[in-house]
Amino acid sequence: MDYNNFTSPLDPTVKLKAKEEEALTDPTYYRKLVGKLNFLTNTRLDIAYSVQNLSQFMDDTRQPHLKPVFHLLRYLKTDPTLGIFMSRDTNYTLRAYCDSDWAVCPDSRNSISGYHVLLGSSSVSWKSKKHATISLSSAEVEYRALRKVVGELVWLSRLFEELTVLFPKPIVVFCDS
């Protein structure tokens, strides 16, 4: 297999659906793989969204759900040295990035939001989550994402102040529109 051409954790053209094609006769293999990938998200931030996406199909795994798992494994094989490392850099600027995808789920039309918080050049917090309710507009989804990341930043800033880690204020949050 050629592992050099996998530059993203999931194929962006593939949209997985819940009830397509035939169910796997034994979904144990799929569940074990996704469970191990879920554990790996503790150190591989780049696969968090992909694993969250694949985890939705644990209870009713179908044949098309296996291909993205193997794609993700091949992506991991491309550069096994990637991970989360704390930089020695003394730049303690706290900044955050957030993004949302409105009505992305083809089955439920629910949206997905995520954020990534950095202290200097080191990742300190991240999250990717499918919303429990349907949003009426993309603006509503973006505001929800901003609310989540600001809540996380308030918590982190209080934690860092308690640990006497000084960082410049105000904290910058980057969000697309």
Predicted regions and their residues:
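Long, low-complexity, charge-biased intrinsically disordered regions
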Residues: 1-177
